[in-house]
């Protein structure tokens, strides 16, 4: 049976969405941040073990055997190539794709705002993002806490120092023993504790910025020069929903390449296929990435929260079931 042809969101809701997108663009115009447009597909993709990509194949002239292509999970790699080419501060509002969940807060194809500020570190970027959130959400000044403090305050355990057994005991108190007890990977266990135990307890009245994530979860962020246990990475939560993920961007090509290779090793150990590494990005880092910070923000979730709805379908014209 076919689903209805009509949009999930009303025209009134879509006009409200358009108004917020205009607000966001004006925010960056006022700060002289250039809007850019990068490919939705690439020959390479992310290696992160927690991200699942859509894959297709180009079979045009010169590619009789097919050229694998991946839909981008974010525009990060292409935008960093622009930064290395001298673009200066840039932002993009685009479609991103993740072959994962479909539901209240997830759609396989979603709208992302990503921006990079040359000369900023992650604290500077949190300051700027706080201003944007106050404007769009009509919220107060965000609260800030380290990843370590969030765990200690909410769960009574230290994510940087406590043993796996202690972390599993915390999971047991949340009724997660069946998932946590067999888990051997520390970061997977920490992410379980954070998503189930911490997220719902922070950022209820105003958005919460959580920063200084474990170095093992650095992804594309720099390691903190004053504490090698943590990375210059932050995430943003509001009313139990993850809104954004930001970095003081890593600019060392060999370290970034090693992280990608380590991810692929981990993927193989987990029974997942290794992913093709984006060597264009590595070459761009070799050419020189300016000191900068960047963040990716989920637009659909932001608009849903700003307008007081409880499902992203309420602010999306044609979500996955109707697409």
UniProtKB/Swiss-Prot annotation:
Domain of life: Bacteria
GO molecular function, one term: acid-ammonia (or amide) ligase activity
GO cellular component: cytosol
E.C. code: 6.3.2.-
Residues binding substrate, per UniProt: 74-76, 116, 249
Alphabetical UniProt keywords: ATP-binding, Ligase, Nucleotide-binding
Enzyme class: ligase
TM helices/strands, residue ranges: none
Catalytic reaction annotation: D-beta-lysine + L-lysyl-[protein] + ATP = N(6)-((3R)-3,6-diaminohexanoyl)-L-lysyl-[protein] + AMP + diphosphate + H(+)
GO biological process entries: lysyl-tRNA aminoacylation
Binding, ATP: 98-100, 107, 242-243, 298
Any Pfam family matching the protein: tRNA-synt_2
Family membership: Belongs to the class-II aminoacyl-tRNA synthetase family. EpmA subfamily.
Primary role: With EpmB is involved in the beta-lysylation step of the post-translational modification of translation elongation factor P (EF-P). Catalyzes the ATP-dependent activation of (R)-beta-lysine produced by EpmB, forming a lysyl-adenylate, from which the beta-lysyl moiety is then transferred to the epsilon-amino group of a conserved specific lysine residue in EF-P.
Quaternary context: Homodimer.
Name of the protein in question: Elongation factor P--(R)-beta-lysine ligase
UniProt organism field: Vibrio atlanticus (strain LGP32) (Vibrio splendidus (strain Mel32))
């Amino acid at each position: 049976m076919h689903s209805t042809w009509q949009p999930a969101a009303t025209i009134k809701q879509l006009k409200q969405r358009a108004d917020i997108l205009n607000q966001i663009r004006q925010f960056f115009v006022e700060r002289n941040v250039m809007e850019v447009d990068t490919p939705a597909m690439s020959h390479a993709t992310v290696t992160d073990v927690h991200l699942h990509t859509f894959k297709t194949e180009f079979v045009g002239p010169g590619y009789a055997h097919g050229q694998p292509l991946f839909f981008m999970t974010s525009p990060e790699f292409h935008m960093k190539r622009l930064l290395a080419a001298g673009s200066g501060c840039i932002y993009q509002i685009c479609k991103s794709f993740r072959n994962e969940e479909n539901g209240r807060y997830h759609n396989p194809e979603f709208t992302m705002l990503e921006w990079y500020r040359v000369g900023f570190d992650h604290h500077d970027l949190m300051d700027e993002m706080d201003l944007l959130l106050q404007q769009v959400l009509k919220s107060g000044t965000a609260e800030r806490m380290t990843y370590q403090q969030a765990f200690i305050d909410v769960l009574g355990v230290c994510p940087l120092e406590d043993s796996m057994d202690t972390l599993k005991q915390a999971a047991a108190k949340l009724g997660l023993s069946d998932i946590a007890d067999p888990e051997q990977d520390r970061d997977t266990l920490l992410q379980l504790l954070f998503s189930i135990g911490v997220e719902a307890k922070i950022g209820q009245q105003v958005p919460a910025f959580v920063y200084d994530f474990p170095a093992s979860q650095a992804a594309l962020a720099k390691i903190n020069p004053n504490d090698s246990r943590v990375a210059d990475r932050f995430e943003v939560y509001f009313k139990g929903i993850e809104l954004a993920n930001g970095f003081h961007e890593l600019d060392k090509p060999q370290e970034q390449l090693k992280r990608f290779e380590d991810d692929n090793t981990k993927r193989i150990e987990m029974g997942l296929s290794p992913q093709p590494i984006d060597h264009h990005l590595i070459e761009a880092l070799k050419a020189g990435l300016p000191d900068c910070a960047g963040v990716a923000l989920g637009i659909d979730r932001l608009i849903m929260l700003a307008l007081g709805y409880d499902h992203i379908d309420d602010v999306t014209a044609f979500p996955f079931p109707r697409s």
